[in-house]
């Protein structure tokens, strides 16, 4: 029996169609920080604040050809993209805390619907969650990234954008105490971080990681599940800690060493909103990864 395969195009042709994803194929390794408030009914508490210094391996592989989407209101389009596997472990205990396969896609401009070029991230989370997030902003800038604060304070009411503080933060001292009293992990984080300030704004870990670097170019992709897409969860997750929204910014940086050589570095900040006991709880992850 004959088996037909779709042949991959030349690598320069494949990467030329990836847009801002072109530098991703390969393996990125580095470290980061994870903050999550999770339910703790089993221990007779409303929640538990968990902090992890992390070690991460993020592997990207280019999809070797066109991904045709057939049109009925306009001509067909071709998507292009990369598949990825993200593996995150606790840097102190060396236990795995996250694994995520997924896709990044580069979508061309369309007329039906009328929409500009965009990027899409699809992810599978082994807690029973499927994610679809689309770009809200992307650009290329000279120099390094502008990393704005990302608030970890739990809140009620409307979910703000990633870099906007919540309008109605929780003020109960019993709920806020872990966000000021919990020590940071003792290993794998940049030196000199203030614990309370870092818990309040985990993006400080990203700023500390690139202090003193000569970043000459940065590709920026901001994504969210809010405008289009979303998160689909199994019923247990919906009832106990519903993942309702994801927002993230990825910075793909070209860094120049003092000897003139350059390397590629990936930084990201991601916020997933978990909803339980009537409160929105930001689950924030950051990392700085170097392409191998």
Q: In which residue ranges do the predicted regions lie?
A:
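Soluble ligand-binding/transfer domains with enclosed cavities or grooves
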Residues: 2-292
């Amino acid at each position: 029996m004959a088996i037909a395969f779709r042949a991959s195009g030349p690598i320069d042709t494949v990467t030329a169609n990836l847009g801002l994803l072109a530098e991703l194929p390969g393996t990125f390794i580095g470290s980061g920080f994870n903050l999550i408030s999770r339910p703790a009914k089993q221990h007779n508490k409303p929640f538990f604040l968990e902090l992890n210094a992390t070690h991460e391996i993020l592997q990207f592989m280019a999809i070797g050809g066109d991904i045709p989407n057939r049109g009925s209101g306009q001509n067909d389009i071709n998507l292009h993209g990369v598949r990825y596997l993200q593996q995150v472990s606790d840097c102190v205990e060396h236990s795995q805390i996250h694994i995520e396969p997924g896709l990044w896609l580069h979508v061309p401009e369309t007329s039906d619907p009328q929409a500009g070029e965009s990027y899409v991230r699809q992810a599978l989370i082994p807690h029973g969650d499927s994610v679809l997030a689309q770009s809200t902003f992307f650009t290329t800038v000279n120099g390094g990234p502008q990393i704005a604060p990302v608030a970890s304070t739990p809140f009620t009411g409307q979910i703000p954008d990633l870099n906007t503080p919540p309008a109605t933060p929780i003020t109960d001292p019993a709920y806020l105490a872990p966000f000021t009293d919990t020590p940071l992990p003792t290993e794998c984080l940049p030196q000199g971080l203030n614990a309370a300030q870092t818990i309040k704004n985990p993006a400080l870990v990203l700023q500390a990681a690139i202090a003193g670097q000569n970043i000459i170019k940065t590709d920026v992709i901001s994504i969210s599940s809010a405008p289009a897409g979303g998160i689909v969860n199994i019923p247990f997750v919906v009832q106990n800690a519903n993942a309702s929204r994801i927002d993230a910014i990825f910075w793909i940086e070209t860094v120049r060493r003092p000897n003139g050589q350059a390397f590629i570095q990936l930084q990201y900040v991601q916020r997933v909103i978990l909803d339980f006991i009537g409160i929105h709880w930001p689950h924030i992850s950051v990392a700085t990864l170097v392409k191998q």
